[in-house]
């Protein structure tokens, strides 16, 4: 190239930049998920500790706190199992009725086999049916 670097060096630099952008996406997604969860937990803990609240409201706040804790554990398990299947990174978002999983792609798009592997993991960990599971590739 004009600056004296080889085409190989340019390509690897672009690859590094793309890898950094994907890594940044996953780090940012995890941070946003945690900040959102921390905010919700703070409000729920306040509600559970409110002396003026009726018992039903306190019980509901405590149930939601337990659900958030369970979702957190399930997300971590899904992420670890997906990465154990050979994917470089992923982030899972679990709620009561659905799960979304974002996978670091290879640039070739998700294949049916990729979707099947991840769907099987999510179904096993959550008991949800495939129609409640969304799998996508980070670009």
Ranges and model annotations:
Residues 1-126, 130-139:
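Bacterial N-terminal Sec-type targeting sequences
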């Amino acid at each position: 190239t004009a600056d004296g670097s080889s085409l190989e060096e340019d390509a690897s630099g672009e690859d590094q930049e793309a890898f950094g952008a994907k890594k940044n996406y996953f780090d940012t997604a995890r941070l946003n998920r945690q900040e959102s969860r921390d905010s919700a937990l703070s409000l729920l803990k306040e509600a559970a500790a409110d002396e003026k609240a009726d018992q039903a409201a306190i019980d509901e706040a405590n149930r939601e706190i337990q659900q958030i804790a369970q979702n957190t554990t399930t997300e971590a398990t899904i992420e670890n199992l997906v990465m154990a299947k050979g994917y470089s990174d992923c982030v899972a978002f679990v709620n009561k009725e659905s799960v979304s999983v974002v996978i670091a792609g290879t640039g070739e798009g998700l294949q049916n086999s990729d979707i099947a592997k991840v769907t099987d993991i999510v179904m096993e960990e959550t008991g949800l049916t495939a129609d409640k599971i969304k799998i996508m590739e980070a670009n």
